Each structure stands twice: as C-alpha cells, then as structure tokens.
C-alpha cells in the first residue's frame, strides 16, 4: 500500500510506549462500558478485570447514554444486536462523541447480515475512536461488500489494508484488522503486531475481548493508534504466555486470564514485536 508507511517499533519519538500505557491503565483502572454480545459478556468482563480495568455491562436504553458520558471508554460490539441493544448502542455512541469519551466499534459479521450491517454503517458515521474487526468485516464496512462467513473472516489481512485506510481517512478513526499478524492504521501510519497465538481463534470471545482491551487502553492515551497498538501487544503477548501451558482451548482460555493478570510492563517492553 503506497499510501501507508509502516512504522518502526517506536511510533513517535519521545512518546509513551506500550509498556508505559499498560502501567497507566493499571494505575487508573479505567471504567469500560461494554455494549457487547450475549455470547461473550462474561469472558469480556473477566478479561478487563484481569488486565486491571473495571467493566460495566450497561446496555439498556436511557441508561447507556448517561453512562457513556462518565465512563472512561465505551465498547460497542454488534455480535448479538437485539432491538433494545441496538437502541442503546446508538444512544451511547452519540453520548460518547458529545462527551469526548473514547469508544470502539466492533462490527461483528457486518456485510453478512442486514440488521447489523445497517447499524454498523450508522455507527461508523459517528467517527468511533477505533474500529476493530477481521479482514472481511473491515472490507464489508468500507465497501458495502458481503462480508465473511458469519463472524469468521474469509479474506486475508493484507487484502483489507486499502479498505482499512479508506475507513480511517473517511471517518477520522483508527482501524485495527485482526489476523495472524494484526495490522493497525490511521490512514497514514501503519503498524503490524507480530505477537499472538492461533488458540485465540478457538475461544469464543477471543477477538471480541480485544475490542474491550482497546477501549481500556484508548482511555490512557490521546493517540488512538498508539493505544490500539499497546492493547494488541499486551493482549497477544498474554496469549503467547497462555499458549505455552495450554493443553487445549479450555485451558488456554483460563490461562489467558491468568496471563493478562501477570503480564508486566517490563515483559511487554521485552516481548513486543512491531513492524
């Protein structure tokens, strides 16, 4: 992609590192409002708690907007968008935008299903701080394509970079494309994160929880690209640690929570691999 210039390990000289942002997160214990899908609610909350953030599953209309104004960050995940939650998501997105609260959009299965596709396009027009999805979701959101196979990607990450750049520049957002190597761009800078384990794809909520982690990190830094990179690095380094002792997806899921609790800024500094 000629429009994007890959960054080196240090995104901007003299600015906080991923390790610094993890330390800030644990000191601040950000309050993360999660409007997320019913399948992953418990796992997402546990991931945030293990990391050092405070989850709040506030997804009821008339409550979601006021809460978004006081939360440290808001996650909107479209995995199971029933009617009441759709209303709450739009309400929270407007409130977050008006209050300056960072918020993350995870457009699960956009393009594949009509209700969430319409909702995703309505929400992305409100300029989320970060959009996180797999390659097929990002392509569908940017181009109006058909998307992947439900929640699963059918496109490679590299194939989504033009779409990610277009989304980022059009809506003034950072776009994180998840895959074997995560790609994160603001339409001008591009960072690749080379840590992570395939076990993440075998645990329900493995990707959705990353959106919540990005929300927590977005509250620690005014540069959402840097926050998204730090979130991805911290989460995937913990996944690598968990995979070392895993016997299967069940032990990996439990091990991931333990690793998120145990991962230190020093370990992130030593283990982070960016290009």
UniProtKB/Swiss-Prot annotation:
Catalytic activity: 5-(2-hydroxyethyl)-4-methylthiazole + ATP = 4-methyl-5-(2-phosphooxyethyl)-thiazole + ADP + H(+)
Residues annotated as binding ATP: 132, 178
Gene3D superfamilies assigned to the protein according to its UniProt record, in alphabetical order: 3.40.1190.20
Enzyme class: transferase
Involved pathway(s): Cofactor biosynthesis; thiamine diphosphate biosynthesis; 4-methyl-5-(2-phosphoethyl)-thiazole from 5-(2-hydroxyethyl)-4-methylthiazole: step 1/1
Binding site residues for substrate: 57, 205
Cofactor: Mg(2+)
EC numbers on record: 2.7.1.50
Keywords: ATP-binding, Kinase, Magnesium, Metal-binding, Nucleotide-binding, Thiamine biosynthesis, Transferase
Biological process according to GO: thiamine biosynthetic process; thiamine diphosphate biosynthetic process
GO molecular function: ATP binding; hydroxyethylthiazole kinase activity; magnesium ion binding
Function: Catalyzes the phosphorylation of the hydroxyl group of 4-methyl-5-beta-hydroxyethylthiazole (THZ).
The family this protein is said to belong to: Belongs to the Thz kinase family.
UniProt name for this protein: Hydroxyethylthiazole kinase
UniProt source species: Clavibacter sepedonicus
Gene name tied to this protein: thiM
């Amino acid at each position: 992609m000629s429009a994007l210039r890959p960054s080196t390990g240090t995104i901007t000289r003299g600015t906080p590192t991923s390790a610094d942002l993890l330390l800030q997160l644990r000191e601040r214990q950000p309050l993360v409002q999660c409007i997320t899908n019913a399948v992953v609610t418990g796992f997402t909350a546990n991931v945030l708690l293990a990391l050092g953030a405070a989850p709040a599953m506030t997804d009821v209309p008339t409550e979601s907007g006021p809460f978004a104004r006081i939360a440290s960050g808001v996650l909107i995940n479209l995995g199971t968008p029933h009617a009441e939650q759709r209303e709450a998501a739009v309400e929270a997105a407007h409130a977050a935008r008006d209050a300056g609260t960072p918020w993350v959009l995870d457009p699960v299965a956009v393009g594949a299903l009509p209700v969430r596709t319409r909702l995703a396009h309505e929400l992305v027009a409100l300029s989320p701080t970060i959009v996180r999805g797999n390659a097929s979701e990002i392509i569908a959101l940017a181009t109006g394509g058909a998307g992947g196979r439900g929640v699963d990607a059918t496109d490679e990450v590299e194939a989504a970079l033009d779409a990610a750049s277009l989304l980022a520049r059009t809506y003034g957002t950072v776009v994180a494309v998840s895959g074997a190597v995560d790609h994160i761009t603001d339409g001008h800078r591009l960072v690749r994160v080379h840590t992570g384990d395939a076990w993440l794809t075998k645990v329900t909520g493995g990707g959705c929880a990353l959106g919540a982690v990005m929300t927590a990190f977005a509250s620690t830094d005014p540069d959402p690209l840097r926050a998204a990179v730090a979130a991805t690095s911290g989460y995937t380094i913990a996944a690598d640690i968990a995979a070392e002792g895993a016997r299967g997806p069940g032990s990996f899921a439990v091990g991931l929570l333990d690793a998120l609790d145990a991962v230190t800024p020093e370990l992130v500094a030593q283990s982070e691999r960016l290009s």
